[in-house]
A protein has these predicted regions:
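Peripheral, non-AAA+ core regions of ATP-driven protein-machinery
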Residues: 1-213, 217-224, 326
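Conserved catalytic network of the ASCE P-loop NTPase/AAA+ motor domain
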Residues: 25, 56-59, 94-95, 127, ...
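The Walker A (P-loop) glycine that initiates the GxxxxGKT/S ATP-binding motif of P-loop NTPases
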Residues: 216, 280, 302
């Protein structure tokens, strides 16, 4: 017998709804998962097997095959566990799954653990026509921000099955109101004494969304001025706030910033941040970098002007490879206002020498 369920594969802020197909057939007992899966999904076999048994259900002693379709889409992460288990149980139980998608990682005792990236997953599933989401309880609040979707938070596989069978009535999670005050990193410009010229530069940069270079010795107030620049920017609208919250959800950093906050974010990465940490990337699930987390507000970087400038230039121009050499491309939002702070001893002129590199390259 074949049973199906719906989940989703993450690709940056977009993605593809994934159909989980389970076939239970006669043969030697086995459990196979196919469909261009990553290591975390292959390990789901042991998590699902243990969770199903410890939740009080029988695991079939037959040949079990799970297919994650479409097969050409790479799939990573543990968020498919719940969908696989529900589809498996559906092979011998009546579980209505019309317009329902399941997201969540299973614990060995049958509990449901939270995963990163639930908000962008919920947005994409809602756009594809899914009207009901079953997610881990700790992710329910962020998923409920998506309009037109009924979000059910569950703490265990047994509760999810009981809800689908109609034995338990779970109320949909109410969406928290947008506009909740959150940590934006902003500083009141009026709290900064003197610095009249710098304040004027901040006002011009905020009004025209111009990038800003601040040159001064340590302790001159460059970081405080950059935080004040974030405070000068207007509130985000609802769509922008959801985009920002989706980026933080994908990075697993919603604890740093409430998903309902309308204030522009502020990021100040350390000068030793790697290129991947700055512009994003990674294998499997692509992680947004600091410049993506700063959009559409302020990103501040200190010192090491040459290295950071080379990284940003390389990111701007992109790799010079033909399209045929690219297996996959992922685009992340990177629309931000860049504030740069450096010391007088560092080269800041395009015409000046760069440390260890000779004359600066043409801008």
């Amino acid at each position: 017998m074949v049973a199906t369920d719906i989940s989703r594969a993450v690709q940056g802020l977009s993605g593809v709804p994934v159909t989980v197909e389970v076939d239970v057939a006669n043969g030697l007992p086995s459990f196979t998962i196919v469909g261009l899966t990553g290591r975390a999904i292959q390990e789901a076999r042991e998590r699902v097997r243990a969770a199903v048994r410890n939740a009080g259900f029988d695991f079939p002693q037959r040949r079990v095959t799970v297919n994650l379709a479409p097969a050409e889409v790479p799939k990573e992460g543990s968020g498919f566990d719940l969908a696989i288990a529900v589809a498996l149980l559906r092979t011998w139980r009546e579980l209505p799954l019309d317009d329902v998608a399941c997201i969540g990682e299973l614990a060995l005792d049958g509990g449901v653990r939270g995963v990163i990236g639930v908000l962008p997953m919920a947005r994409r599933l809602a756009a594809s026509g899914i009207r009901r989401l079953i997610v881990p309880g700790e992710n329910a609040a962020e998923a409920a921000l998506v309009e037109g979707t009924e979000v059910i938070g569950v703490e265990s596989l047994a509760v999810a099955v009981a809800y689908l069978e109609g034995r338990v009535d779970l109320a949909p999670v109410a969406a928290p109101p947008m506009g909740e005050v959150g940590a934006s990193g902003g500083v009141d410009l009026a709290a900064i004494r003197s610095q009249a010229l710098a304040k004027r530069a901040l006002e011009i940069a905020a009004a025209g969304r111009h990038n800003l270079l601040m040159l001064g010795p340590p302790g001159a107030g460059k970081t405080m001025l950059a935080r004040a620049l974030a405070g000068l920017l207007p509130d985000l609208d609802a769509d922008e706030a959801l985009e920002v919250a989706s980026l933080y959800s994908l990075r697993g950093r919603l604890s740093d910033r409430p998903a309902t906050s309308l204030r522009p974010p502020f990021r100040a990465p350390h000068h030793s941040v790697s290129r991947a940490g700055l512009i994003g990337g990674g294998a499997g699930i692509v992680q947004p970098g600091e410049v993506s987390l700063a959009q559409p507000s302020v990103g501040l970087s200190h010192m090491r002007l040459g290295a950071q400038r080379r990284d940003l230039r390389a990111h701007h121009h992109g790799p010079r490879h033909p399209a045929s050499d690219e297996a996959e491309r992922c685009t992340l939002l990177q629309r931000f206002l860049f504030g740069f702070g450096t010391h007088p001893g560092h080269p800041v002129s395009a015409a000046g020498p760069w440390p260890g590199r000779g004359p600066a390259p043409a801008p």
